[in-house]
Design a protein with these regions (language model features):
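Hydrophobic adenine-recognition pocket in adenosine-nucleotide-binding enzymes
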Residues: 37
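Short, conserved active-site loop motifs that form the nucleotide-linked donor/cofactor pocket
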Residues: 12-14, 30, 118
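C-terminal lobe and adjacent flexible extensions of AdoMet/dcAdoMet transferase-like proteins
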Residues: 128-134
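C-terminal alpha-helical "lid/dimerization" subdomain adjacent to the S-adenosyl-L-methionine
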Residues: 66-119
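Class I SAM-dependent methyltransferase SAM/SAH-binding core
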Residues: 1-23
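Conserved beta-strand signature within the Rossmann-like core of class I S-adenosyl-L-methionine
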Residues: 50-68
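A conserved beta-strand element that flanks and buttresses the S-adenosyl-L-methionine
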Residues: 33-34
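Short conserved loop adjoining the S-adenosyl-L-methionine
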Residues: 22-27, 43
């Protein structure tokens, strides 16, 4: 869908699928984006992913993910129960927030990945945006 929309608007975009942790090196691009994936990784895997993204990015990396906090967990619990009757949704949403990193943790992981001058901002709903510019 993204590729189709970009082509309709004459925007150059390349999407690729790969093993994020052990696959071949990422192709070089101006910006490498990771969205709602980091919370599925442990600390070492997150560091590996950030290193691989930084190596491939010519300009910047962006990581948008869930932020673990008491408030976010409760908001997701309420929203999942109000908006869905699925027991999978009721369990998956809060569990994903519980498994996510908080902002100080993701900053520390970025530091361990060798990223300097990382910026982390709160984003709605229940997320943060980590940005690093080379």
């Amino acid at each position: 869908l993204v590729k189709e929309k970009a082509q309709q608007n004459n925007l150059p975009i390349e999407c690729f699928e790969t093993d994020a942790l052990e696959g071949p090196p990422f192709p070089s691009h101006d910006v490498i984006i990771c969205s709602l994936f980091l919370h599925h990784l442990d600390n070492n895997e997150a560091i590996t992913l950030m290193k691989r993204m930084a190596k491939a990015a010519r300009v910047a990396i962006l990581i948008n993910d869930l932020e673990r906090s008491w408030l976010n967990w409760n908001m997701v619990w309420v929203a999942s129960h109000l908006l869905s009757r699925s027991p999978v949704v009721h369990m998956d949403g809060p569990r994903s927030v519980a498994g996510a990193f908080n902002q100080s943790e993701v900053l520390e992981l970025a530091k361990k990945a060798g990223l300097i001058n990382v910026k982390v901002e709160t984003r709605w709903p229940c997320r943060y945006l980590l940005s690093w510019v080379k």
